[in-house]
Amino acid sequence: MQHGSLITVEYQTVNYVSGPLIFVERPKEISFGETAQIILPDGEARTGQILDISEDIAVVQVFEGTRGIDSHVTTVRFTGQSPLLDVSYDMLGRVLDGVGRPRDGGPEIIPEARLDIAGMPINPYSRDKPAEFIQTGISAIDALNTLVRGQKLPIFSGAGLPANQLAAQIAKQAKVLGEGENFAVVFAAMGITYKEASFFMKEFEESGALERVVFFLNLADDPTIERIATPRCALTAAEFLAYTHNLHVLVILTDMTNYCDALREISTAREEIPGRRGYPGYMYTDLATIYERAGRIKGCTGSITQIPILTMPDDDITHPVPDLTGYITEGQIVLSRDLFRKGINPPIDALPCLSRLMNLGIGPGKTREDHRNVADQLYASYAYGRDLRRLVAIVGEEALSELDRNYLKFADHFEKRFISQGNVERSIETTLQVAWELFSLLPDEELKRIKEEYIDKYRTLIISGG
């Protein structure tokens, strides 16, 4: 992230320091969102941004943290510019810190452009409808909650669930079907541990996926305030790759709960009136400025698809972070602790999951003609099997009919064979084939959500071993 201008204004009127914020008295001719350099007595320079301005006070957030800042001898230099990020096609394959500085020991990014990390608002009329299928290689997503190019589809996880493994698997495997497609991944990690960072680096390097990944890494011991800039820097890089170099970019943001906690910390330091669970009342608007930067633009070949990942505290889907995220985004993938305890990997709970744009990315010429019918039948059969499990807990399995026992068996096989796949990548054809193999547990007359022509065509192939 860069700053600077030929004309700058300096102040030595720092009033006091509170958390990641400093308060500067009597500022003049400065603007909201402007960057600042904080110069310490030993010459160390830190980067900040104006959060709030009143007649007498400017509130500046310091990205590197405020430790060591003495309000009496610290100089603040306002630059007259918004925070900028150096962007280049050569960012692919690089590991950067939360504000875009090299973290891999490599050279500085030689910029093709310097862009405002806040992005530019997109005219709604210029947006194009998401339409193309993105294959993640994960059956529970590809078949039941299809990811469409230009969509924002979050993953709701719980503490200790393998969300990081799922994120790494998606980053390695995601592709747009068809030859000649330029595809890249921008991966932004916020507040993760060294162990988690090492896991991601190892996964990307061993698979060779690092060559097409831009990695923004903010560790748990990095300044909390830096997390506010990390997703915006990542999306700025994604917009440059998508709209300048015509790449189809998948942006993975993890963990958005850490981002929101940083937002709460800043709000507390500013002594704002808290909202639900202490989060600021403007958190919905703030999250929207991140999530709404996904999509496609008419006349542009490139696109941005988002997968935000967040941790639900106490597995509570009504917590403000998943709750507000669900309002803004176009569906959700929910990880289940019960499935995780059963050894199902990935532990995706199909029933509360949703992809609102799924129908735009499936069907003939995109996936396969029977995709919608197969997904509907899988949902219906699995939901009935889950209901029967609760009934069995009361009356016992002996009270069930033979057909009901088949549905129980279907639910078990659905979890163990369809949902659970470990690190194995499945094509959409393989995923649909596994689904048809599961349907062999049920008689034809129970496949009420599938057209007869598809039953005749695909069930015959399974029976014949085709």
Curated annotation (Swiss-Prot):
It is a peripheral membrane protein. This is A-type ATP synthase subunit B 2. It comes from Methanospirillum hungatei JF-1 (strain ATCC 27890 / DSM 864 / NBRC 100397 / JF-1). Belongs to the ATPase alpha/beta chains family. Signal peptide: none annotated. Keywords: ATP synthesis, Cell membrane, Hydrogen ion transport, Ion transport, Membrane, Transport. Gene3D superfamilies: 3.40.50.12240. GO terms for cellular component: plasma membrane. CDD domains: ATP-synt_V_A-type_beta_C (cd18112), ATP-synt_V_A-type_beta_N (cd18118), V_A-ATPase_B (cd01135). HAMAP family: ATP_synth_B_arch.
